[in-house]
Amino acid sequence: MIIKRTPQAASPLASWLSYLENLHSKTIDLGLERVSQVAARLGVLKPAPFVFTVAGTNGKGTTCRTLESILMAAGYKVGVYSSPHLVRYTERVRVQGQELPESAHTASFAEIESARGDISLTYFEYGTLSALWLFKQAQLDVVILEVGLGGRLDATNIVDADVAVVTSIALDHTDWLGPDRESIGREKAGIFRSEKPAIVGEPEMPSTIADVAQEKGALLQRRGVEWNYSVTDHDWTFSDAHGTLENLLLPLVPQPNAATALAALRASGLEVSENAIRDGIASAILPGRFQIVSESPRVIFDVAHNPHAAEYLTGRMKALPKNGRVLAVIGMLHDKDIAGTLAWLKSVVDDWYCAPLEGPRGATAEQLLEHLGNGKSFDSVAQAWDAAMADAKAEDTVLVCGSFHTVAHVMEVIDARRSGGK
């Protein structure tokens, strides 16, 4: 049912989100013309004096979180826009590391609704404009924008980044971004700007990224060429044209993303002390990214949902001391590379607890089992989680993975039970 009545600034956030979901004829409608027009009317095309924009198949969230952590340690006032959220919509906008109240979001939506006139906006475009408006109100020093999909035609690209970052390139969203790494690389490099640093964390960079950098006159800085890092069992070293940083603490986020964030920061020209770098890297953490929630049994949340992320997750699982079995609670979207993702995880998982995800994009438990050959199917993520936890012994590991939605469902179940729900 389409909701025609426009919510007001004082309307609940849930009412606004329901309205936004039904506002535009298409869920994804790549292109910058509509959203740029509304942004100009709102005066949010320059949300802060300095902007980082971060694209990439995987690693965007933790790269943004590391940048945020270091910049805050250095005393900057920082805003971060990221997506999707895990449990609450308000997770998408952080100012000084904190979510804003729902009333701030609804106030921003009312401003956008007033400014857009007859211009139709997607849910993501609306959310992006909202973040930019909130950042402008907060009078920040630095804003970090996480690209939603691709780069060139993503709503975040209406803002000219002072530093553009591409974390990694792998096959995902091929319906929108193209069938191969070269096409995807070209789309993601669309965030590059003339005479501005363009940081690439992907070690096997598609040539199209260099092509776009040359076309735009961007200052390309590639991992393994202009900057690099090396890791030992107990610390890591980073080097670039500015020099070498040694004895860095191993990060809690994936190592390549911490290094990419550091490369972007050092290319930015922003003044940041070595102590702030060390403190920021040590404290950066992001929920749902190899998040060890508890022990006995060990419970790990990871939103890995494509082969590239599953390969990394598999490596992390193999590095853990293993005593018992690994029980995986998994739900996926059917438009992801299910076979490729599961092929990696099979080598570290002993028992599968498969669950369907809701909505038109959700894969059924049976679709997952087709690729696994063995495992149990359940009617919901909550049921799969309960069964895995009931079966797990103290020495076992329960891994929740496959999608943001899967991890979010389990987080919601845990939160509800903690607060006295069922």
Regions found by a protein language model. Name each.
Residues M1-T27:
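Charged, amphipathic alpha-helical linker segments immediately N-terminal to NTP-binding catalytic cores
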Residues P12, K26-I28, L32-P49, A73-V159, ...:
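ATP-dependent carboxylate-amine ligase catalytic core
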Residues I199, P203-Q221, S230-D235, R266, ...:
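C-terminal helical cap/extension that packs against the catalytic core
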